[in-house]
UniProtKB/Swiss-Prot annotation:
Protein name: Phytoene desaturase (neurosporene-forming)
PROSITE patterns associated with the record: PHYTOENE_DH
Keyword check for Flavoprotein: yes
Principal EC category: oxidoreductase
Functional note: Converts phytoene into all-trans-neurosporene as the major product, via the intermediary of phytofluene and zeta-carotene, by the introduction of three double bonds. Both intermediates, phytofluene and zeta-carotene, can be used as substrates and converted to neurosporene. 1,2-epoxy phytoene is also a suitable substrate whereas the C30 diapophytoene is not.
Length: 524
């Protein structure tokens, strides 16, 4: 029996991140016998968690902005998302704490948003409204149109270029915010979102202001149990479909036939898993440079990948505190602590590769919403700081700098947000870009794969249907539509659009030779 025949009706998914799990669910619904392989000990990838001393640390994404995308996924698999996962709407969404003492609170309620803008800068109310109108236009084109179909052919790009021009995709996110409003606080509030998908707000295309419309239209939600609860529920659907989750298992290579067709994978222990369809949720850079290292490639060569711009790195400090549940009452679920510099600090991270003395921080306090995040009376936090990735000549040696940088982060949050927190910390874990490189096999330790600049977006990203190998498909942050929970879930939908239903197994009656009827025999 050939490997191709062995793999008929089987699909292998490399990586149990949200994109891989979404693809696996959809392939299971298409009739494939699916095996998901991941080197970690639990599903979720960057959206997984670790627990220490009763504190659950959500390692990556913390919010859900488009719950309808998840509900659609579940429904397409004959399931009800809301029976499997409990989502809690956030109100307010988050608070931005500026160094001059000003605060901006983002709400789902339009009247509250207008009042907040008017309080900070009355003259910018109309400009803010116009910005949100522009965000809606980009959402309708960029998310509902471009983001929901593959961009695998050059014509897919050419036919949308006029719309890109009309929407001023050449302008940066910050450039668009600057044009609409005059107040620097509001300019930050309208332009910082690309940092949550790995982009430099001063260079990322203004198409990404659509994130503001995502928040407005769908709200900001939190899953009880963290994003890990979503990943666990996805894995449960896959096994209920008859699929298999193989954790603590690393893939060594994607197997390719002489005629250029993916035929399965080889594990590190030498085991081969034949498959008709191979989906990689590993980072696109790792997929091509490592998993296809023995395959000649024409577009995604090592040299071309090395020339790409990768997203920034992340320094993330996870810590638990004792007896603090009633402390810091003005600190909610999500807070952004802004440093004294904006553009210059972003340039340090993305252009110069320098670890600056100042910083902007995202502070996540899930225990104010989710009692499962920490022991009763305690708190769980994660504090995230964007930092350079590992691709600079003057790169940061995190084995030396991690503790020093953590001390700087502690100083900022004690002074600005959580006074006295140092003496309350009982558990902690630190992730640096080196952790992202080693744990997630992320090129240069990038937090969000390829940076979403205009010439690294849509058709310019590694395609969902591999250009190098037939029968190989890519999902996750490094392919189309990009990073962020809605996009990686959407990448699973895109590959499912391109993959036909599994072949139906032959029934015994259909497979057996037809018996001659007496009449047919007599006629001979």
């Amino acid at each position: 029996m050939s490997k191709n025949t062995e793999g008929m009706g089987r699909a292998v998914v490399i990586g149990a991140g949200l994109g891989g799990l979404a693809a696996a669910m959809r392939l299971g619904a298409k009739g494939y016998k699916v095996t998901v392989v991941d080197r970690l000990d639990r599903p979720g990838g960057r959206g997984s968690s670790i627990t220490k001393g009763g504190h659950r640390f959500d390692l990556g994404p913390t919010i859900v902005t488009v719950p309808d995308r998840l509900r659609e996924l579940w429904a397409d698999c004959g399931r009800d998302f809301d029976k499997d996962v409990s989502l809690v709407p956030m109100e307010p969404f988050y608070t931005i704490d500026f160094p001059d003492g000003e605060k901006y609170t983002a709400y789902g309620d339009d009247a509250k948003v207008k009042a907040e803008v008017a309080r900070i800068s009355p003259g910018d109310v109309e400009g803010f409204r116009h910005f949100m109108w522009d965000a809606k236009a980009r959402y309708e084109f960029g998310y509902e149109n471009l983001g929901r179909k593959p961009m695998s052919k050059l014509w897919d790009l050419i036919k949308v270029l006029p719309t890109f021009g009309w929407l001023r995709a050449d302008r940066s996110v910050y450039g668009h915010a600057k044009k609409m409003v005059k107040d620097d606080h509001l300019r930050f509030a309208l332009s910082f979102h690309p940092l949550f998908i790995g982009g430099d707000p001063f260079h990322v295309t203004s198409m990404y202001i659509l994130v503001s419309q995502l928040e407005k239209k769908f709200g900001v939600h939190y899953a009880i149990g963290g994003v890990q609860a979503i990943a666990d529920a996805m894995a449960k659907v896959i096994t209920d479909q008859g699929g298999e989750m193989r954790l603590n298992t690393e893939v060594d290579e994607i197997l390719v036939s002489r005629d250029g067709k993916a035929t399965g994978i080889r594990l590190m222990d030498g085991t081969e898993l034949p498959a008709q369809v191979v989906v990689s949720n590993a980072d696109a850079g790792h997929t091509y440079k490592r998993l296809l290292r023995n395959r000649d490639r024409w577009r995604w060569t090592d040299e071309k990948l090395d020339k790409k711009r990768w997203s920034m790195g992340l320094f993330v400090w996870y810590f638990g505190t004792k007896g603090t549940a009633k402390m810091w009452k003005d600190v909610g679920h999500h807070t952004v602590v802004v440093g004294p510099r904006y553009k210059e600090h972003v340039q340090d991270i993305f252009i110069k590769g320098e670890l600056a003395e100042d910083m902007s921080l995202y502070v996540h306090r899930p225990s104010v919403t989710d009692p499962t995040a920490a022991p009763k009376g305690d708190d769980t936090f994660y504090v995230l700081s964007p930092v350079p990735n590992l691709g600079f000549d003057n790169g940061v040696d995190w084995s030396v700098e991690a503790e020093k940088y953590k001390a700087k982060v502690l100083k900022v949050i004690e002074e600005r947000l959580l006074p006295g927190v140092a003496e309350k910390i009982t558990e902690e874990v630190v992730f640096t870009p080196e952790t992202f490189r080693d744990r997630y096999l992320s090129p240069l330790g990038a937090g969000f794969s390829l940076e979403p600049r205009i010439l690294q977006s849509a058709w310019f990203r590694p395609h969902n249907a591999s250009e190098e190998v037939d029968g190989l498909y890519l999902v996750g942050a490094g392919t189309h539509p990009g990073a962020g929970v809605p996009s990686v879930i959407g990448s699973g939908e895109l590959v499912a659009q391109m993959i036909p239903d599994a072949p139906k197994p032959e029934t015994p009656a259909a497979a057996a030779p037809k018996a001659r009827t007496p009449r047919a025999k007599a006629a001979q």
